[in-house]
């Protein structure tokens, strides 16, 4: 089976998956850990109705869809917040003058506002519709190239809050991929420093950024 269909079993029969990938499922949805997480926490919400699952997210996600799946999005956000609370504490540093880090692991709204993003890829790589709920650290061994990073940190990623698109024309798939995945510079998600096309330098910088803010309990 093509890798494009790797999510199919989680949609059709999540109860048969014999690993810890599935965090929750019911008749409407499966919530799973991304098998190739691009951040410390990276969850996927998969609608189980085949009509939805086979649809393009930019075309099918409307106000009704959002209302139906909002509670699942909130559940995935809660999962990420609990994970960070249980695993990490904020590292206090005289060099860290950014107030957004003060008590971020105690204030869920602050954590979500500054450190979680929810949305879709404008050109999905997988056949089954999925919504990303991901922590904005990009601290992961699975983050391996410019395409991985820019797919979440440019206009290639469409925020849940910006949906539905209401017919907005994004361009062809090729135009979108060229603009955001190939030609767009690498900008640090913490400080906006421009790394041009130097992914290895960005990767080291992201490690330093994460470790300057978080430490294991």
UniProtKB/Swiss-Prot annotation:
Region (Interaction with DNA): 34-38, 121-132, 144-148
Taxonomic source organism: Saccharomyces cerevisiae (strain ATCC 204508 / S288c) (Baker's yeast)
An individual GO BP term: DNA damage response
Site (Interaction with DNA): 10
Listed Gene3D superfamilies: HIT-like
Domains (record comment): The HIT domain is required for enzymatic activity.
Reaction catalysis annotation: a 5'-end adenosine-5'-diphospho-5'-2'-deoxyribonucleoside-DNA + H2O = a 5'-end 5'-phospho-2'-deoxyribonucleoside-DNA + AMP + 2 H(+); a 5'-end adenosine-5'-diphospho-5'-ribonucleoside-2'-deoxyribonucleotide-DNA + H2O = a 5'-end 5'-phospho-ribonucleoside-2'-deoxyribonucleotide-DNA + AMP + 2 H(+); a 3'-end 2'-deoxyribonucleotide-3'-diphospho-5'-guanosine-DNA + H2O = a 3'-end 2'-deoxyribonucleotide 3'-phosphate-DNA + GMP + 2 H(+)
Main location: nucleus
Glycoprotein in keyword set: no
Gene that this sequence comes from: HNT3
Biological role stated in the UniProt entry: DNA-binding protein involved in single-strand DNA break repair, double-strand DNA break repair and base excision repair. Resolves abortive DNA ligation intermediates formed either at base excision sites, or when DNA ligases attempt to repair non-ligatable breaks induced by reactive oxygen species. Catalyzes the release of adenylate groups covalently linked to 5'-phosphate termini, resulting in the production of 5'-phosphate termini that can be efficiently rejoined.
Protein name (database record): Aprataxin-like protein
Annotated ranges, domain HIT: 6-139
GO CC terms, sorted: cytoplasm; nucleus
Binding residue positions for Zn(2+): 188, 191, 205, 209
């Amino acid at each position: 089976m093509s890798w494009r269909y790797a999510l199919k079993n989680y949609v059709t029969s999540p109860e048969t998956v014999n690993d810890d990938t599935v965090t929750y499922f019911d008749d409407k949805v499966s919530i799973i850990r991304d098998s190739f997480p691009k951040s410390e926490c990276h969850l996927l919400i998969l609608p189980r109705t085949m009509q939805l699952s086979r649809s393009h997210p930019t075309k099918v996600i409307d106000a009704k869809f959002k209302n139906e799946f909002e509670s699942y999005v909130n559940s995935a956000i809660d999962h990420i917040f609990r994970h960070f609370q249980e695993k990490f504490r904020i590292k206090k540093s005289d060099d860290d003058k950014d107030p957004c880090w003060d008590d971020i692991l105690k204030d869920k709204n602050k954590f979500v506002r500054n450190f979680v993003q929810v949305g879709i890829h404008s050109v999905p790589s997988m056949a089954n519709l999925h919504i990303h709920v991901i922590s904005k650290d990009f601290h992961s061994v699975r983050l391996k190239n410019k395409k991985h990073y820019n797919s979440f940190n440019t206009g290639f990623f469409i925020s849940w809050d910006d949906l539905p698109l209401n017919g907005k024309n994004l361009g062809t798939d090729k135009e979108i991929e060229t603009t955001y995945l190939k030609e767009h510079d690498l900008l640090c998600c913490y400080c906006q420093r421009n790394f041009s096309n130097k992914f290895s330098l960005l990767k080291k910088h992201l490690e330093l950024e994460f470790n300057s803010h978080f430490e294991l309990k």
